[in-house]
Design a protein with these regions (language model features):
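Short hydrophobic targeting helices and cationic amphipathic motifs
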Residues: 13-16, 27
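Short, Lys/Arg-enriched N-terminal segments with co-localized hydrophobic residues
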Residues: 26-42
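Active-site catalytic motif of lipid deacylating hydrolases and related acyltransferases
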Residues: 44-97, 216-217
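Gly/Ala-rich beta-loop-alpha elbow adjacent to hydrolase catalytic centers
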Residues: 104-113
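The alpha/beta-hydrolase serine catalytic core
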Residues: 120-241
Length: 241
């Protein structure tokens, strides 16, 4: 990696009341494996934050779980509340409760993840301007792309939601110091036609941890395997595969 310049990766890969809190997908809940009893204290934990109109039960979260399970990595993947005024307190409390070693985000999740300071974070195609995007995309009912734990099938984008995103976005990048710059990585698809905040990331975090990969906005298995997982393993100090 050349410091001070983006890395281009080529290859084959193209606080809410308790009753109101969304379910959290904890992908560590599997039968214990033989010989693992003494590893409990060394388990690593990832908090995965999904994109807009998605859920914790999406392909990237599931793949992280499957690929890292053998390394005793827990993946906590919440269904983020659709309203930003509810989502941010919910996520701050979740971080306090779960104490993740690493936060990995996709799209809208990067907006929230940027503000969860003090923890190493990987922001993949972060959507830092949700208010503007939703304003131009139009308001109305949207269907969730993935299964939600509460059974919800759709939700409404309205002026209140957009205003809440706009207020939240005012807090972006505040107080970013050298320590925060060292903790945060930005991964950007070279062919992302939906969202591209490379310049914003570089302005506030520099280019040392800015990675440009051969891909689009939505992640696929090849990109997760070739780009995301190697970085996650490195940051968690796991054996390279």
């Amino acid at each position: 990696m050349r410091k001070g310049a983006p890395l281009s990766c080529g290859g084959i890969f193209a606080c809410l009341p308790l009753r109101a809190r969304p379910k959290v997908h904890n992908f560590a809940q599997r039968p214990a494996r033989a010989g693992c009893d003494n590893k409990t204290n060394t388990m690593k934990k990832i908090l995965f934050l999904h994109g807009f109109a998605s859920s914790g039960h999406n392909g990237t979260a599931i793949m992280l779980r499957d690929q890292l399970y053998a390394d005793d990595v827990t993946v906590v993947a919440p269904d983020i509340p659709v309203m930003p005024a509810e989502a941010m307190p919910f996520l701050r409390q979740l971080v306090a409760d779960e104490k993740p070693d690493l936060i990995v985000t996709a799209s809208m999740g990067g907006l929230y993840g940027e503000m969860l300071r003090g923890i190493p974070r990987v922001l993949i195609n972060p959507a830092f301007s949700m208010a503007k995007r939703l304003t131009f995309d139009g308001m109305g009912h949207r269907e969730f792309y993935n299964k939600r734990e509460d059974g919800a099938k759709d939700f409404k984008v309205d002026r209140t939601m957009i205003d809440q995103f706009r207020e939240l976005e005012k807090q972006l990048f505040k107080g970013v110091d050298a320590a925060e710059k060292a903790r945060v990585w930005g991964l950007f698809g070279e062919h992302d036609k939906r969202v591209n905040h490379q310049k914003d990331f570089a302005k506030h975090y520099g280019k040392e941890h800015l990675v440009v990969f051969d891909g689009e906005h939505s992640l696929n298995g090849a990109v997760v395997s070739a780009v995301v997982l190697p970085l996650v393993r490195r940051l968690l100090e796991l054996p390279a595969h």
